Amino acid sequence: MAENKDEQLTDEELAQLQLAEENENAVDRLVQELGCPTRRIRQFAARVLHLLAERDPQRVVPCAPALIEALDRPEAQTRWEALDALAALATTCPERLGDAFEGAETALFDESSSTLRYAAFRLLCVWGA
């Protein structure tokens, strides 16, 4: 299954994901980039953290506060990637996600992005299961 998912990744995503799997400093850099003033960098960091959370949720558990904070970013993609990463953590550490509720609820009613609404719905379903 992971091979099929890897085929859908860009070369840059795959390279950063592999680096994050091997190097804790790379994960720390991605967390810092979630707060970057550049939208594209925030989106990319959230995407890689989402992919890493699906592969190895334990490596992303310490990033939960930064992912929750990313739910306040203006662009939908950063928020849906953060929601998807948090959904991957919901079965591992649901107790660390309490502060995500408000951001997920806000995203659930965001009329501008169906992808964002769906990501919020998935998080709330997995978290509540």
Which ranges hold each PLM region?
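Alpha-solenoid helical repeat scaffolds
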Residues: 54-55, 91-95, 129
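Alpha-solenoid helical repeat architecture
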Residues: 2, 34-37, 71-74, 108-112
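Alpha-solenoid HEAT/ARM repeat scaffold
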Residues: 10-14, 28, 43-46, 79-83, ...
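Alpha-helix N-cap/helix-start positions at coil->helix boundaries
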Residues: 7-8, 24, 39-40, 76-77, ...
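N-terminal "cap/leader" segments of large eukaryotic alpha-helical scaffolds
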Residues: 1-33
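A contiguous pocket-lining binding segment that forms or flanks enzyme active sites
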Residues: 102-129
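Amphipathic alpha-helical scaffolding segments comprising HEAT/armadillo-like alpha-solenoid repeats
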Residues: 21-33, 57-70, 94-108
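Structural signature of alpha-helical solenoid repeat scaffolds
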Residues: 50-51, 87, 125-126
